[in-house]
């Protein structure tokens, strides 16, 4: 999924410039991506589309996020730490964090990693045309580097 998202970010200015899902799926197949990766990415994009009513503005509520038992059973501690870091740095709003967590909970537990959370965060921020602080953006973009080689051309 990471490579598919990197491809989308590289080839489309933003979420709105992507073709409809069925056309995008064919385009990604022609680009050589695995159908399972394409399906997972399209599912995550659908979650984002259905969550578009959330605010992209970072909230300054200072509220503490309490994770449910299901979330603590599935989300690694490092992922929960990343979510807290992104809130503290005002890189994502509380609503955006909830969308990311919701998307992560749709992924098999053994596939949930910090890099997966970073990539989903990038996908969400790209979809919302959000600006990021440089250091936070660099940290998130590091997830798009596989085997120390950029996936984007």
From Swiss-Prot:
InterPro entries: Smg
Top-rank taxon, per record: Bacteria
PANTHER family listed in its UniProt record: PROTEIN SMG
Family: Belongs to the Smg family.
Entry protein name: Protein Smg homolog
